[in-house]
Amino acid sequence: MNKDIDVSSLKIDLYSDKSVRDFTADVAQKDGRMWLSNVSAEIAAEAAALAVKALRKSGLGDADMKNAEHFIEVLRKFFLKTVDQELQSRAEWDKEVAEGKSQAYIEGGVFAACSEIDEVLYGMIKLIDMIESVSDKLAPEACADAAAAVSIGRSAMECVKLQRYHYSTLITGDVNSMAMRREPELAIADCTERYEALYKKLQDKLK
């Protein structure tokens, strides 16, 4: 969500306050605050970290490599921030439900939540495109990290799609529900073949 939300009076366990152990324990709770949407952003950050490592292993003397490293490092920090932003947004959403707001008002929150996790989806598409643009310049010893970034990044995209599937069950109207599901499906399908080829290319460079 792009709007500023006053969450000072709400009790929120933020990702930034947790260790990996605590975060994964929260994810495992059936009624926990860490949803698939939070996991998608965390996975995206891991993919970005691996991509940055691959670029740094390969050397940043080339302008394209340096630009890619800077852009993906910014994305890594953005994805981590998104984990907490989504938690804060849902805290406000839960408050609206508790206060008995109208269904239309609550559905507005659902659509806003979708917009927020979409930034993970499209940010990851841009990230993998950046890896592809410099793939010929990656050192062989960096390609395992780069290939893993592609694979893990695609998992983050699938998590966004599945979270949208869940969100689609919270709104009324078949058209709206279908549209909420179809957007990530189409975005992922549009790049699947290309990303599979990139993964194979990077894997082959390890031989």
Named regions from a protein language model:
Residues 2-207:
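Conserved, well-structured ligand/cofactor-binding cores
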